[in-house]
From Swiss-Prot:
Protein purpose: Mediates inactivation of the TORC1 complex in response to amino acid starvation. Required for meiotic nuclear division.
BP GO annotations: cellular response to amino acid starvation; meiotic cell cycle; negative regulation of TORC1 signaling; positive regulation of autophagy; TORC1 signaling
Protein name: Nitrogen permease regulator 3
Gene designation per UniProt: NPR3
TM region positions: none
Top-level taxonomy: Eukaryota, Fungi, Dikarya, Ascomycota, Saccharomycotina
Species the sequence originates in: Scheffersomyces stipitis (strain ATCC 58785 / CBS 6054 / NBRC 10063 / NRRL Y-11545) (Yeast)
Length: 721
């Protein structure tokens, strides 16, 4: 398993409330939470335990309890028809067997302890024999609901914050919402306002309670999870962040405004009084209670890693745990990922905006967290990109249940992977840039579109290193032939993009004629959608050679020495002069003495200047002698190696002098190329592709080509995805 693979580990949802009469369980989903999710009908006994201790690894798959290490059924995980079969590695198998051994021993000890505890309970209380059947049907994983409610209804001080408790290797995670002392479910913006309206709110709350006859103090939507041990923190954190916290706050808002939870709880309790049979009761709850229907839909969607479109008090809300199908760099060989994932450095630029959930490139590593200050700028950059629909336009319109003649439907039909969103907004009279960005964000969130650079015949495309050739190729060959019967087959098309004998070339060389342009772009869109092809992009760094650094160093030394020489001369010539007014009688009486002093100062200044010139001459002689020796080049304030500027857009004073030396002295760029150079400067960080520069800046390909030829000795260029 890996962080890149969806694994919600959700096995159930509980709704707990607390009133004056105490906590109670209102609803649970799924209804049958009395067994382990993958528990077999048979149980461990002493003979089975003895057999497993002497057996080899071949019988480990007989015990589904071992699958808790990975949170899935082992039959499914290692089945050739299952997705995870194609993602396994040698390291996966070794760690799998080691963890199975540990879990097997734990299961053996647990089975023995469980039988002993059951025997002791029966021996101490014989009456439990007759009641075991009834209580077992209502228990939740062997725990009595009343006892579980006491643990899942925390005190008031522990509410309105994250709640997490582990019971029998299962995580009960939630955000308990408790009402405040003033009767409100939400904190007001000002404490003075709370104090001023406290009596009024309390009175109104008492009136509401008398009408509703349900004094609801707390409600808690609890998610039951069994994540893998090695993914424990990651899985519960993403569940709480993306689903639990947001859904609980939405429910708190509806309870505060409309008493939504209170009214639904009353309805559920009434239905429980009317219908005693479980199947009929469950059917009535789903048909009549919108809260039960919401919990049911949430469990089904989130447990299957789908988007949960929930109706909360007749308002549509969407929740999901994002799936990682976007990668900015190639994952390690031992890191599994979803087949068909997209590989592009553009993901790294937009990953900080929240639009894209970037995949992990290392095994169980931390998520990429580039703390860029330009997050809002990166979000604005989306208008320069294009959208690639991940399904047919009409199918998307039907799935998201929007009006066929609505603005969103028109926008979806307008989307073309060859045009940027900015061009779409200028081409449409009814859509501005903000609306286009908003619609794009929604389609990306709903997993209906992907951000790409606009397709162009001048761009270069090649077979992605993450192409699902080993998993989906044979199926996709038929699908590609069905969608594009007049084009070459899928393997042949991929061979055209990435030939063995030469480098990949522009996409225009693949298209036979102008008449084939549209169909070839459609085929290219299909290949990018399913992860077979990605764009080849150009990245550059600005290189500062040792020669440039020595010249700048010499300029700095010359400036420093000339500055010191001028300062000394000023001090010697002007330091003893006194321009203050004096008594004429005193001046006439001391003229001879002042003239003698001035003569002495001029002589001293002449001597000091001659000494300075002698010292400068001696320094020059030392430099000449050092140059003539073999150790001369090593005597420098700078390193011998060249320097690569990682962020020339934020260059220091010294780095700016290096850059100016390249522009004006070494390359002697014209004014037009100098302006183009300064536009290109912030893209010389090895992270921003030049193709993005062409999209954002008002600069032509010809001008870029001339500039790169002029400064080719001072740049390092790399081409990759």
């Amino acid at each position: 398993m890996s962080y890149n693979l969806p694994n919600p580990s959700l096995i159930g949802i509980l709704l707990i409330i607390s009133t004056h009469s105490g906590p109670q369980l209102i609803y649970k989903q799924p209804p049958g939470l009395t067994k382990e999710p993958d528990e077999d009908e048979g149980e461990y006994d002493q003979e089975d335990i003895a057999e497993t201790e002497s057996d080899e690894y071949g019988n480990y798959f007989e015990y589904d309890e071992d699958s808790n290490m990975y949170g899935t059924n082992l039959y499914k995980q290692w089945d050739a028809n299952h997705l995870n079969y194609y993602m396994g590695t040698k390291k996966d198998l070794i760690s799998f067997l080691d963890e199975i051994e540990t879990k097997r021993k734990q299961a053996s000890m647990k089975a023995v302890a469980k039988k002993r505890s059951q025997l002791s309970k029966i021996a101490s209380n014989p009456s439990t024999i007759s009641t075991t059947g009834n209580s077992g049907n209502d228990s939740i994983f062997g725990i009595e609901p009343a006892y579980l409610c006491e643990m899942l209804a925390p005190p008031k001080k522990m509410c309105n914050s994250r709640f997490e408790i582990m019971i029998d290797d299962k995580i009960f995670l939630g955000l308990p919402v408790h009402k405040y002392d003033n009767g409100s479910w939400r904190l007001k913006g000002s404490s003075k306002r709370i104090n001023r309206n406290k009596e009024e709110n309390t009175h109104q709350h008492e009136v509401d309670n008398s009408k509703s006859k349900l004094n609801l103090n707390m409600f808690h939507l609890v998610f039951i999870m069994n994540p893998p041990v090695i993914e424990y923190n990651y899985r519960i954190d993403e569940m709480f962040h993306y689903v639990i916290s947001r859904l609980s706050l939405v429910l708190r808002y509806e309870q505060s405004k409309n008493d939504f939870i209170s009214n639904q709880v009353k309805m559920i309790l009434n239905l429980k009084e009317q219908f005693k049979e479980k199947e009929e009761l469950e059917s009535q709850l789903l048909n009549k209670s919108s809260l039960c229907k919401m919990i049911h839909d949430c469990y089904l969607s989130i447990s299957q890693s789908k988007i949960a479109n929930l109706s909360v008090n007749n308002k549509l809300r969407s929740f999901q745990i994002p799936i990682k199908t976007e990668f900015h760099s190639l994952p390690e060989s031992s890191v599994p990922f979803i087949p068909g994932s997209h590989l592009s450095s553009t993901v790294g630029l937009l990953g900080t905006t929240g639009l894209i959930n970037v995949g992990e490139t290392t095994r169980y590593g931390e998520a990429m967290n580039d703390e860029n200050e330009g997050i809002s700028e990166a979000a604005d950059d989306i208008v320069y990109f294009a959208l690639l629909l991940l399904d047919d336009a009409e199918s998307i319109i039907r799935d998201i249940k929007t009006e066929s003649s609505g603005t969103l439907a028109k926008f979806i039909r307008m989307i073309n992977p060859t045009e940027s969103l900015l061009k779409l907004s200028t081409r449409s009279n009814s859509l501005d840039t903000l609306q286009v960005k908003s619609f794009a964000f929604h389609l990306i969130y709903w997993r209906r579109a992907r951000v790409i650079q606009p397709l162009s015949t001048r761009s270069v495309y090649f077979v992605s290193p993450m192409a699902p050739i080993t998993t989906n190729l044979y199926t996709d060959i038929r699908e590609f032939k069905k969608s594009f019967p007049t084009l070459p087959s899928l393997p042949q098309f991929l061979k055209l993009l990435s030939p063995q004998s030469k480098k990949p070339s522009q996409f225009a060389t693949v298209i036979p004629s102008k008449d084939h342009r549209d169909i070839y772009f459609e085929a290219l869109s299909w290949l990018i959608r399913f992860g077979y092809v990605t764009q080849l992009q150009t990245f550059i760094w600005l290189k500062i050679s040792r020669k440039i650094k020595i010249k700048v160093e010499e300029d700095l030394e010359n400036e420093s020495s000339s500055r010191k020489r001028s300062n000394i001369t000023k001090k010697l010539l002007m330091g003893g002069t006194d321009n203050s007014s004096k008594d004429p009688a005193a001046e006439s009486s001391t003229d001879n003495r002042i003239m003698d002093q001035n003569d002495d100062k001029e002589e001293n200044a002449t001597k000091q200047l001659s000494n300075i010139n002698a010292e400068d001459q001696e320094i020059e002689n030392i430099k000449e002698r050092l140059k003539s020796t073999s150790l001369g080049p090593l005597v420098s304030l700078e390193d011998d190696d060249d320097t690569i500027l990682l962020d020339p857009g934020r260059a220091t004073t010294l780095e700016r002098r290096w850059i100016n030396k390249i522009i004006f002295d070494e390359c002697k760029l014209s004014s037009e190329l100098t302006n183009a150079f300064y536009k290109l400067l912030k893209y010389m960080d090895g992270k921003s592709p030049l193709e993005l520069l062409l999209l954002k800046e008002n600069i032509s390909r010809t001008e870029i080509r001339k500039l790169l030829i002029a400064i080719e000795d001072h740049i390092i260029s790399v081409r990759h995805w």
